[in-house]
């Protein structure tokens, strides 16, 4: 095990609530069930830009996604991982309860059983893009939206009648992952996006693509599915997206899962639709001290699903079945580059690609 410094360079929240570079951020202590990773790459997610108001406290490290080399392994770790292994994972950045948690740092502490071992053939840039997205989408689909089907990529649907699932926002990074996972689970994904991205989403496995701006979008989906659509995953979660999802679901109702809190007023318009939303970091099992409706006690159920899902993802990764979203990678990156990338995402200047930074 490498000797770890007490302090490190990281992106931490300043007194004004913005992220800035700190050269004396704390390095997390090695806990029994954790590993410590020397960061080789990070990626930027939209959630990373939403922590500046009431979420993190000054000194907390930001960021979720990381990839790097294991430098320390906790005494209680049972997963086969060792110093020198290449791994990727996601942590809870911007954590008021644990300021040393966060991926935008030289060293990252992560739960061993919710990390993935990267094959040598997978570059750092690709590896860091596979964490938050694929964990969150797995939870959304197989823990919240489709539990009644009891399907996963390792146990796909085997029925004679195809089952269609709507992915609203298929050209996002979570959307392309959802389309792939649904296809691997033996289901039939259809999606919404801009017409310029129709070819993109179909290349990931979407059976049909619909223009979300079309005034007949929901009606077109409903007609194509013969009013039998039962499942909708909302990767955008706006008032318009939930309205289209609800209107597209069949006359008998169904299930709707969002990736953010949804509009209760719209959800109340159809009592036959069971609505919920997913919060990927619950899979870490930690108490979440963020404002409502995000804050909540740690969930053993979500933690158990996270560990089980990590094993599922590891198998997909090793078999080459996880295709990343289109990436814009910066090699030889600095923390200043990451700050610039966060600004781009916050200003809505990134579309159809994911920003990753390799150090």
UniProtKB/Swiss-Prot annotation:
Keywords: NADP, Nucleotide-binding, Oxidoreductase. It is an enzyme of class 1 (oxidoreductase). NADP(+) binds at residues 212, 259, 278. One of its GO terms (molecular function) is oxidoreductase activity, acting on NAD(P)H. Pathway: Secondary metabolite biosynthesis. InterPro entries: ADH-like_C, ADH-like_N, GroES-like_sf, NAD(P)-bd_dom_sf, PKS_ER, Trans-enoyl_RdTase-like. Its EC number is 1.-.-.-. Trans-enoyl reductase; part of the gene cluster that mediates the biosynthesis of macrophasetins, 3-decalinoyltetramic acids (DTAs) which feature a tetramate (pyrrolidine-2,4-dione) unit connected to a decalin fragment and that have potent bioactivities. The PKS-NRPS mpsA together with its associated enoylreductase partner mpsG incorporate one unit of acetyl-CoA, seven units of malonyl-CoA, and one unit of L-alanine to assemble the linear tetramic acid intermediate corresponding to the backbone of macrophasetins. Monomer. Belongs to the zinc-containing alcohol dehydrogenase family. This is Trans-enoyl reductase mpsG. It comes from Macrophomina phaseolina (strain MS6) (Charcoal rot fungus).
